[in-house]
């Protein structure tokens, strides 16, 4: 989330100072932001199955302990 906010602020500052018609870098920053988002989504997708292996066991143990 911090990276996204930094990219948004940087894009706004540069777009205002240069003018949107000359702001080719806005597309570059947008592509970088999309790449970061896809990488994070892929990372979460890879970790989720591993997390699902361990969490049901922990939930079972806590349910058995409370009974």
Curated annotation (Swiss-Prot):
Ejaculatory duct of adult males. Male-specific peptide with moderate activity against Gram-positive bacteria. Keywords: Antibiotic, Antimicrobial, Immunity, Innate immunity, Secreted, Signal. It comes from the Eukaryota. This is Andropin. Residues 1-19 form the signal peptide. Its main location: secreted. It is found in: Secreted.
